[in-house]
Amino acid sequence: MSHDPLSDHKRLIREVASIAGLQVVEPAERREWPQEMAQEAFIGLPGDFVRLIDPHTEADPVALLGNFLVGVGVLFGREAYAVADGRKHYPVEFLLAVGDTGSGRKGTATGRVMPVLEAVEDNLASRVLSGLSSGEGLIKGISPTEEETALPDEVRRFLALLPEFASLLNVMKREGNTLSAILREAWDGTRLRVLTRKEPLDVDNVNLSVIAHVTPEELLNNLTATDRCNGFANRFLVMLVRRSKLLPEGGGDVNISPIVGRLHTAVEAAKGRGLVERDKLARALWADEYERLTRSREGLRGALCGRAEAHVLRLSLLYALLDSANEIRPEHLQAACAFWDYCERSVEHIFGGASGDTDGEKILNALASGPLAITDFYRLFGNHRDREWIQAKMAAMVRTGKVVATVKAGDRKESVAAWSLKGTVRE
C-alpha cells in the first residue's frame, strides 16, 4: 500500500486540534451543504417570482428569494411597520449572499431582481448606492439636496449594492472609520449622525436596504472580532448560495410583467398602512417559536444569530405586505421562520465550531508549535498586547483546561515562565 503524506498531515492537524480542544472545520465546499430552505419560504408573490425565473437562470433559488425580499423593502419605505417591545421595525433588511467567486452566481440573482424593482419605481436606479467607504460618505450620499430640504418628513429610501463586501470589511478596520456604526443605525431605523467633525452630518427618516456579496474565504478572513460581537454582522441575513444548474446557452428573457403588476399593487396597498400586527393564530404560533428563536447559542454562532427574532419579525412583515394583507398571518410567520432557519444553518456551515475568540484561537494555533513566554506573545501580537493583558488572558485559558503553565528557555537561555498546550509537555 502506498504511503499518503497528505493523510499523515491531516492526521497530525487533528491530533494537535484534539489536544487544544479545537474542532477541525473542513472547507465549506468539502462539507455537506446545509439542508435546503423549506418550501414554506416560497409562498405568495416572492415564491411565484422565484418559480418564474428559476428555469431561466443559474442563480440559486434561495438567492433569488433573498434578493427579492430585501429589494422590495426599498419600495415599501415606512408606510407600514411592526412593533416589538415598543420599537418600530420597518420592512428593512440586510442580505449577505455567501458563495464562491463566479460559480456562486451571487450577482446573477441580484441582476434578475433589479429589473422588477425598477419597473415598479422608475427612478429607483438613482437611489442605488455602491462603493461605500465611510459613514460620512454614506450620510452625504443619502442626504436631501437643497431643493429637497423643504420636505423634512419625506422618507429617504435607498438600496446599497455591495458586490465587494470584503473591501467594505477592510475599510471598516481603519481607525476612526464610522461606516459600521452608521450601517448599524440604518438597520435600526434611527437618525444617522456623525458629530465628531466641524460640520456635523445628520439625516433622519432613512430606509436603507443592503444586498452584499462575499466568498466564504473572504468572510472568514476579514470579519473581525469586533464586527462579530458589536452587532454589525448579526444585522445581516447570511445566506449560502451556489449555482443551481448549468445553462450553457445562458438564461433566456422572462416576461416579468405579471410580477411587476402584482408588486405594484402590493406597494400601493401598503401606503398609509401603519402598524401591522399578527392575527390571533399567528400570535399563538409566535408564542411557540419565540423561545426557540431567542435561545442562547454558543460561540460565534451565538454572536451572529443574536437578532433572530427581529429578522423573523421583519421578514414576516415583508411576506404580509407582499400579500397585501392587513395582518401577519401564520403562513407569513412560517415563511419567515423557514427563511431564517436556512440563514442560521448557513452561519453554522461557514463558521463551524469557531468560538469567536480570535485572540484565543490565535494563541492556541501558536502554542501548537511549542511553549510560549511573555516575549513570544509580544511578537505574536505585534506588541499590541501588554504584560497585564497577556497574563490575564493566559490565566483564563489555563482555567479552561486547554493550556498549562510551564517553563522554557528565554532569549538569554535562562528559564522563564511560559505556557503550552495541555498534554504536550511534562507539567
Regions from the language model: what does each represent?
Residues 2-427:
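Phosphate-handling catalytic cores of nucleic-acid transaction enzymes
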